A protein has these predicted regions:
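Bacterial N-terminal signal peptides
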Residues: 2-12
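Carbohydrate-interacting regions of secretory-pathway proteins
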Residues: 16-21, 33, 37-325
Length: 325
């Protein structure tokens, strides 16, 4: 009953926030100057909770932030932006008046040279490896049909081709050697949690059950070791690659296990390369020891794959690995 109630509440929350989800994300378009000249403009909009949003707008060499507020109920899907911004002595100040509605961010920017008009469409950039099929020789851990490869934990299940997490971290039944690993994940929309906090769609992919690559809604946030893509307490991503919540993302990981001699003494550290949504965020990073929270603080030549439960509704699908070496 508890599980059914939780599922019902989760689905209700999702349905109520679909239009609010569309108020945030990536937007691409153009701005037209009073002269008729057009130039490209992009925006990344983050939901801050209680109807508040911030649009991080990039045009020419300028990056500005404009705050917005939903009109009426958030689920009605209308956010208004009214703010004056200063772009420095060369460009001057502009009075921004705009709105996001029906997946379009449009409006005007009034400056000393007249009225500029902008229009941007919401886009889902996706990952080039999204939906990638397991190659020959790979071991499929999750194909959307069952949980056979995993040690079953309460409330974990597969629905609509997606593995849903709840209550406990989960690990594979088998241990594996060095590998190429593909994982697809989706973080939940949690606008009332502070951006950049650990409470905004938290989970983790533990390679060998010991080395965590963080999963988190870190859309637009500067890279940190404890945000999405970070190797917890070990390495900061080289660049931002996080997509908005409720959009499927990918990790493509090449992991070389630590090596040991016949006596059990370690002769080489683990090495990891991570691509997040097709972008290299860790390149041959040496891992001298495990990260916290895994199955063991002792290293090994083989290990399980573990997905961390951190009390948030993170979803996984299309998980496979191919042994290497």
């Amino acid at each position: 009953l508890t599980g059914c109630l939780a599922l019902s509440l989760s689905l209700t929350a999702m349905a109520a926030s679909v239009k609010e989800i569309e108020l945030q994300g990536n937007f691409d378009g153009s701005v037209t100057a009073p002269t008729g000249e057009t130039m490209p403009v992009t925006a990344q909009i983050v939901a801050l909770g209680k109807g508040e949003h911030v649009a991080k707008i990039s045009v020419a060499d300028a990056l500005v932030e404009v705050k917005g507020m939903t009109k009426g109920k958030a689920e009605d899907g209308l956010c208004l932006y009214e703010q004056t911004i200063d772009l420095g002595p060369e460009m001057g100040s502009f009075k921004i008046s705009g709105k996001v509605e029906n997946r379009v961010f449009s409006g005007t920017a009034e400056g000393s040279d007249g009225m500029h008009k902008f229009s941007l469409n919401r886009v889902e950039k996706g990952s080039p490896t999204l939906g990638q099929k397991a190659p020959e020789g790979a071991i499929v851990l999750q194909d959307g049909t069952n949980m056979n490869a995993w040690i079953q934990e309460p409330f974990w299940d597969v629905r609509d081709g997606v593995m849903n997490m709840s209550g406990h971290s989960i690990r594979t039944k088998e241990e594996f050697p060095s590998m190429q690993l593909h994982v697809e994940f989706k973080t939940p929309f949690m606008p009332n949690e502070e951006p950049g906090s650990q409470a905004r769609g938290n989970s983790g992919v533990y390679v060998f059950g010991r080395y965590e690559v963080q999963v988190l809604d870190s859309f637009t946030e500067a890279p940190r070791d404890n945000l999405c893509g970070g190797i917890y307490q070990k390495a900061v991503p080289l660049t931002k690659a996080c997509l908005p919540p409720e959009e499927w993302q990918t990790y493509d990981i090449e992991f070389h296990a630590p090596k040991f001699d016949a006596s059990g003494a370690k002769t080489a550290d683990a090495i990891i390369t991570v691509k997040h949504n097709g972008i290299t965020i860790h390149d041959k990073v040496v891992l001298p020891s495990p990260t916290p929270g895994g199955v063991s603080d002792q290293e090994a030549a083989k290990g399980v794959l573990m997905l961390q439960d951190h009390h948030d509704r993170v979803e996984y699908r299309n998980i496979w690995l191919k042994p290497i070496d």
